Swiss-Prot record:
GO terms for biological process: defense response to bacterium; killing of cells of another organism. It comes from Pelophylax porosus brevipodus (Nagoya Daruma pond frog). Keywords: Amphibian defense peptide, Antibiotic, Antimicrobial, Cytolysis, Disulfide bond, Hemolysis, Secreted. The keyword Transmembrane helix does not apply. This is Brevinin-2. Coiled coil: none annotated.
Length: 33
């Protein structure tokens, strides 16, 4: 239902945010930003 699709959207958005944070952190550590 609607709640399930909202949950799926939140999970997908959360993954995207986590991945961008991780890539930003790793490039800063490696000084490749």
């Amino acid at each position: 239902g609607l709640l399930d699709s909202l949950k799926g959207f939140a999970a997908t958005a959360g993954k995207g945010v986590l991945q961008s944070l991780l890539s930003t952190a790793s490039c800063k550590l490696a000084k490749t930003c």
